Each structure stands twice: as structure tokens, then as C-alpha cells.
Amino acid sequence: MTTRLPPVDILVVGVGVAGSILCKELAATGLKIVGLERGRMIDPQHDFAMPYAHDELKYDRHSDILQNLSRETLTFRNKMQEKALPMREMGSFKPGECVGGAGMHWGAHARRFLPWDFEVRSRTLDRYGTNHMPEDWTGQDWGLSYDEIESYYDQFEHIYGVGGKAGNLEGAIQPGGNPFEGTRSREFPNPASQRTYAGALFAEAAQSLGKTPFQNPTAAMTSPYTNLYKMTLGQCVRGGFCNSHGCAMGAKASPLTTVIPTLAKHPNFELRTHTNVTRVDLDSDGKRAIGVTYIDARGREVHQPADLVILASYTFNNTRLLLLSGIGKPYDPVANQGVVGRNYAYQTGARVAMFFDDKVFNPFMGGGALTTSIDDYNGDNFDHAGQGFIGGAYLAAQSNGATPIRSINVPPGTPRWGGEWKQAAAQNYNRNFSIYAHGGCQSRRGNYLDLDPTYRDANGLPLLRMTFDWGENEQRLSAYAIERALEIAKLIGPAKLGVHPLSKTYSIVPYQSTHNVGGAAMGADPATSVVNKYLQSWDVPNVFVVGASAFPQNSANPPTLTVGALACWTADAIKDEYLAKPRPLA
């Protein structure tokens, strides 16, 4: 029997980066807000206390704060003709499952998207014409420009205490910053990180080629900081253990260090943990949401009525809930019709590893996004004529903290196991670093998300199925980027070089990034998008879908800052426009 609860005004499904912002901003209206989170509550002072915060087995290898794949996972295949199989262990990406979501174990890379990223299709056609379009490309403009969202980027940066140096301040290029970034209305709230030895070597070589290195924006505090919500964070001490871990020093911005504790001050807000939402419930004509159904910690089915439902969980869960709820037309890649599940994209990654006899880097000292980058090859910052691809990559020397299990690098030709491998691992731990080529990914017809016809979760519901492989565009992009990285690496002058290109076929096994996007793309046309520019469902106007699921394709830059900015943007649209007169906003 389903338990029916008293109605509330607004339900937010997922209390991570996006959901926490939406709960906080909407709680100020005085309406009854309920945040539903399927994971457990985290107490950073307990769960991430030293020395336990540096337990790599617990957090990285055993996935303590990540999604429980024994209860729900996804299935994967490269092509439509193949049978998809379940992902049984964390591999290519790491969705979170706790209050704060993936925002608890992220690496604190806090880059904005480029203006080009929001208008990929129109700008590509304007500059290069139709002959430059990738094969089977489904990429599209967002329906939202960089200029429209700039103030919300600024708002989120000041909530998360991002450190950096402006490169384009109100149209004036600033020394020390990224000259290719979109215009900023003001400086970062925190100063840029200090450059490491590896970063200095990279910067010197890049400058000799006429490139413009800068320090990557970071949400690991470069100085003590109190944010817009009066939450105070300490300064990063470069202790490493950022990716896959919480921060023992309370220096990494996350939903639990910047937003969620302030929600306790709002008596009209309630957080419910261990609530696994299984569908959005619709009225008899399917045009209005009347609430959600979830499974609680005791296995009971609960219906929570609400006037407004906001899906703010991870890309996969947002898309799956839309499919399970019958909101929007599922995408059919054969007919190239439908929208839900369309435009799934990822990011490309490649690197050049450098090994030295005469240089020591102490890589155990590092911090979130402690990185020196160049954007000369990012987005459309260079002429793509004749290259055979669109988009680009940023090149970076990263000093994020080399953990003892995951961060073992050995020179090419080293045996994969045994005494010689051990000797090489010990000898080279302190004497290597890599130049990474972080590339974008265009959406295309054969890459999509749908419901698996065979496999089900612990509640008997179909798993999400991913069909994905690299396209020719991504292969060419990554090959170009790794050649540019190799040029810089050779100037640095290592004793040995190891080139690690993009795999010919995408594999879900090795970790790459937790930057999965699309499936509920935003846009100006209901025929090619799930949500409008305010992230409001075209089909069910009292449902908003906020997160990286809204990206129509992926930038080379990490998505978290854009997810946060979109949450701030949507919160304002709901407060200022929708609540006064509930209706389609576009």
C-alpha cells in the first residue's frame, strides 16, 4: 500500500550542487520546500576527519560515498547493434550517493564555459559553413547565451569561493588571466592558486611557443573565505586526496560546506534522506505533475503531492526519471525523433607523461584544481578550417595530489608487474608529471540514453541504458590536442616521454571523468529539446529539470560551475516569474 503524505509547495529531487542551491534560494519565498535525497547524510567533521579522510581504499577504490551499484546501475554498449551489459564496478565515471552528491568528491575545477559553448551550432555554421558539420551531429545552441548567464556564474563563484585571476574584465584583457574567457563583471572572490614547479615548467615552455598560461580557477580555497550565505571555509593546505574524497580541512567548496547547513535556518525546509524517487506522478491527461513517488529507508512506497517538482539530480537519474514518468517523447535514433535521452555526450581525455632524472616534484602535495592551463586550443579559439573537427581542448599541468594507489606512473617499456615494475614505480613517483589534453565532445545521432529492455534495479524498474562511442570528430580533436601537448612536453626536456592517446573505442572500465551530460537537453525548439531556456519541461510546465542533463553537447571545461550557475538562473526564474503566475515561461 502506498502512503500518501500531506501536500507541499515544492519538491526538489536530489540535494547536490544544483539541488542545494535551488532549495536555499526557494526557501526564501516562505513556501514549503522538501528536498529528497536517496543517499545518506554526511557529517564532514566526522566522515572526513583525519586520518580517515585520506583512506584511498574506502573512498576511491570501495566507493564509500558513491552510487551503490548493487541496487541501481546502468547498462552500456558502444553501438545499437550490441547487447548492453550492466556496469558492476565504478569505472569511467563516479556518480555520488549522499547528501551533496558528486559535489562532495569532485576535484574543485571551477571553469566557466566559453561563450562559444552556448552557441556551438550557429557560430560553427556562421564561421565555417555546413561542410564543416560533424557526421550525424545533433548539436544545438542552448537557447541561452553566455551574456545572459554571466551574472549567475558570478553568483555561484561567490557562493563557492572560487579562486582565480580574471582574464577578461568587462571587456579589458587582464595580464595573468585567461584571455580567451568570456567577459567577467568583476574579479574572482579569491586570489589565484600559486604555481607549482610542474606548472612553472609547463608555463615557461608554453610561453616560448607564444601561448598564454594561467592558473586554473579552483574551488579549493586559496585563502580563508566567508561566502554569500555566511559559511566560512578554511584555506587549502595542499594535502592531496581531493578527487573521490571529502576535504579534511573544510577547504573544498561543496554543498555541505557552502549551502546545506544554512537551510536549517528555514523552518519551511525539510531534508529527507534515503528517499529513492521512482517516478514523477502526473494527472490524468499527463500535462501536470501532482507529486512524486519514492521508496523510503524501510522499503515503503510513499506518494508526496506537490505543486512544483524540480529534478536536480545527476545526469543519468534526471533522464531516467523522465523516461520512467512518461515526461517528453523518448528519443528514437533510427528515426532521429524524440528528445528524452538525446544528445548524450561525455569528454575526451589524453595525456603526455614526462619522466625526469634530475627533477623532483613532490606530487603528494597538491590540491583541487591546482593546475596551470592554456586555452589557446580550446573551443573555437583557433582556426578549425581544414582540421576535420569542431571544438577543442585545454592543455594543463595538474598538481592535484598523487595518491599512492591511483597515481603510479612508470615510463614506457616498463614491465606491467614484478620487481622491475616496483623499482620503476618507486624511482619515478617523485620524478614525473603529465600534460593533460581535456577535450570537448559533440553529441551525435548514435549516442543516447534509454531504458534497458532486460535489466532492472532492486525495485524492479528498468535500468538506464547508455549507447556511446567516440565519433570521428572526437578522435581528430584529441589527436590534434595531444600533438600540441607533445610540442610543449619536448620543450620541457624530460628523459623519457609516454603518450597516452584517446582510446579508439570508448571503454566504461578505466576512470576518465564524471562529466556526463545531456539526455534532457535545453533549447529553443520543443522538437529537439526537453526543457526550455529556464530548464522548464516543454510537456509538463510544473516540472523543471536542472543539471548537466540539460547540456546539448559538452565543453572541454568541467561542468560543475555551469551546473551551479544554471541552478541560480532557474531559481530566479521560478521566484520572479513562475510562482507569481504558474505557466510556460518560453
Q: What function would you assign to each model-found segment?
A:
Residues M1-P7:
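A short, basic/flexible loop-to-alpha-helix module at the beginning of a structural domain
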